[in-house]
């Protein structure tokens, strides 16, 4: 699935087109079509309760309507073992499946203090 980047991933502002590749039911790969950059992402709902309001700026930018089919992912920094990998819950990637656009939405940490920028996956695994 090829997406047009409407609001760039921080530090990767030059990337305008990305491909979303499903790896399994939890993980996806987001690969740039402009260079060799790629990100491993996770479905946050597989780990925790995760809710936030999409600011109106992003809704307009991505033409998000109430009926829009959205997918939310979070970038992870992969480590071994996998449980030591960290998840960025502060800046989710929002994908609008209706028009194939995506944006990185940076959440206001004062509004969402429960979400961290580098939370270990092991903190969400039942032991």
Swiss-Prot record:
Database matches in Pfam families: FliW
Subcellular location, record wording: Cytoplasm
Location (main, coarse): cytoplasm
Gene Ontology biological process terms from the UniProt entry: bacterial-type flagellum assembly; regulation of translation
Gene Ontology annotations for the cellular component aspect, listed alphabetically: cytoplasm
Record keywords: Bacterial flagellum biogenesis, Chaperone, Cytoplasm, Translation regulation
Highest taxon, organism lineage: Bacteria
InterPro entries named in the record: Flagellar_assembly_factor_FliW (IPR003775), Flagellar_assmbl_FliW_dom_sf (IPR024046)
HAMAP family per UniProt: FliW
Assembly behavior: Interacts with translational regulator CsrA and flagellin(s).
Listed NCBIfam families: PRK13282.1
Stated role: Acts as an anti-CsrA protein, binds CsrA and prevents it from repressing translation of its target genes, one of which is flagellin. Binds to flagellin and participates in the assembly of the flagellum.
Family in the record: Belongs to the FliW family.
Protein name from the UniProt record: Flagellar assembly factor FliW
Organism: Campylobacter concisus (strain 13826)
Taxonomic lineage of the native organism: Bacteria, Pseudomonadati, Campylobacterota, Epsilonproteobacteria, Campylobacterales
């Amino acid at each position: 699935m090829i997406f047009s980047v409407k609001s760039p991933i921080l530090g990767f502002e030059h990337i305008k087109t990305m491909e979303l590749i499903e790896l399994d039911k939890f993980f996806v790969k987001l690969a740039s079509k402009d260079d060799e950059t790629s990100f491993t992402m996770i479905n946050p709902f597989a780990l925790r309760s995760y809710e936030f309001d999409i600011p109106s700026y992003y809704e307009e930018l991505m033409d998000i309507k109430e009926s829009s089919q959205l997918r939310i992912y979070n970038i992870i920094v992969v480590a071994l073992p996998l449980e030591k990998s960290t998840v960025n819950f502060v800046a989710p990637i929002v994908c609008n499946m209706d028009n194939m656009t995506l944006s990185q939405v940076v959440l206001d940490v004062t509004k969402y203090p429960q979400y961290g920028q580098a939370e270990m996956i092991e903190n969400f695994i039942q032991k």
